[in-house]
Amino acid sequence: MDVFYRPELGLIVEHLGTDNELVDCMDGRLLNPGHAIEAMWFIMDLGKRLGDQALIEKAVKIALAEAEYGWDKQYGGIFYFMDRLGRPLQQLEWDQKLWWVHIETLITMIKGYELTGNAECLAWFERIHDYVWSHFMDPEHPEWFGYLNRQGEVLLTLKGGKWKGCFHVPRGLMQVYQSLERIAEKHD
């Protein structure tokens, strides 16, 4: 939160130089919105345990900035990788939409709403929810596809493999459910 988060960018970077400076090379410019957004719900949980509302608010602010930056304004969904200067990336899969990025964003946004009441978090939760259920879900054989192309079309029909196992989706849906339950209890 104090090193890889760069206030001058409003974003979390993946790599820094030896003196924690921004580096102008492919690795130095690499952004992974999914990692940054996922990390923010971990920070929110930490803030809740510590009773540190300011930490929670900072995590929400960063998560919202990352979602906005990472959102594909042409086709929807969150990019897998980005370059902080908008330059070409060496990762060929940079523009794909991956299941784990989207489930982690659902968790982060509903937790952000639960812990702060921030309406932007709820709006992002709804936006991501709509994208997920209209693009990742297989209506014939329920479970999520893991990999979509930039346009939101299924790239691979497999639903499990080396990287996509039985972790992100069930854990994510459980986290979302628990947050929604707590939100409902507050409004009863």
Regions found by a protein language model. Give the residues of each.
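Glycan-recognition and catalytic cores of secretory/periplasmic carbohydrate-active enzymes
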Residues: 1-188
